[in-house]
């Protein structure tokens, strides 16, 4: 990660190769490999890795999805992204919720399939519905249309920026960024993102996103 941050793709790939030989490959190395492919302009490979991470490792959606969106924007292939997200969200409601949450906290806008996931997130989050005074009656879903979804997204994004987004499953240490080594319990890759935006003392957290 240090190597790729310094723009040394070859050195980063060398470390990844060493990890393969030692059989210590982790999802962390997958993320680094995807970044290397992106910097090397091997966009097809980078997209494949990010898609695999999203499909197989729900807790890293918060890291992989923004990068995937950025790639498709660069390549002007947002329709391909829309098709991919639609297939995922239709086949897995929990994954759709996790995608919606990721879209909110990363302030991703103007992509129809992701907007649908955000709407689904709002409609199916019981705590958020209670906060917005929306009942479980499906007819009351129409109330969401009278509330600016964009305004809700902006408010939740601002709130997410000021609260912890990740928590260690081992000791409970919380942080804004994904930390591979927990500074509290010294365990590797034990942090997971929360699956909803924190409302401080007004609302409570729901469980972490995990595999």
Identify what each model region corresponds to:
Residues 1, 11, 27-28, 62-63, ...:
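Start-of-helix register in tetratricopeptide repeats
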Residues 65-69, 98-105, 130-136:
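Amphipathic alpha-helical elements of HEAT/ARM-like alpha-solenoid repeat scaffolds that form extended
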Residues 9-20, 43-55, 77-92, 110-125, ...:
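Alpha-helical repeat scaffolds
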Residues 57, 65, 71-75:
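Non-catalytic protein-protein interaction scaffold segments in large eukaryotic complex-forming proteins
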Residues 122-211:
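Cys/His-clustered metal-coordination modules, chiefly Zn-binding fingers
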Residues 3, 37, 71-72, 104-108, ...:
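Residue at a conserved register position within TPR or TPR-like alpha-solenoid repeats
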């Amino acid at each position: 990660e240090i190597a790729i941050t310094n723009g040394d793709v070859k050195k980063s790939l060398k470390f990844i190769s060493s990890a393969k030989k030692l059989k210590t490959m982790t999802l962390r190395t997958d993320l680094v490999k995807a970044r290397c492919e992106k910097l090397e302009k091997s966009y097809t490979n980078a997209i494949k890795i990010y898609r695999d991470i999203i499909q197989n490792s729900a807790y890293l959606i918060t890291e992989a999805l923004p990068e995937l969106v950025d790639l498709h924007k660069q390549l002007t292939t947002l329709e391909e992204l829309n098709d991919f997200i639609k297939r995922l969200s239709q086949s897995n409601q929990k994954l759709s919720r996790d995608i919606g949450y990721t879209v909110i906290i990363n302030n991703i806008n103007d992509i129809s399939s992701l907007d649908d996931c955000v709407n689904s997130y709002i409609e199916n989050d019981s705590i958020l519905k209670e906060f917005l005074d929306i009942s479980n009656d499906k007819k009351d879903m129409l109330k969401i249309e009278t509330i600016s979804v964009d305004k809700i997204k902006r408010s939740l994004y601002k709130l997410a920026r000021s609260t912890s987004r990740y928590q260690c499953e081992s000791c409970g240490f919380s942080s804004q960024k994904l930390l591979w080594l927990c500074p509290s319990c010294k365990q590797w890759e034990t942090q997971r993102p929360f699956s909803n935006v924190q409302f401080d003392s007004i609302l409570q957290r729901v469980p972490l996103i995990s595999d």
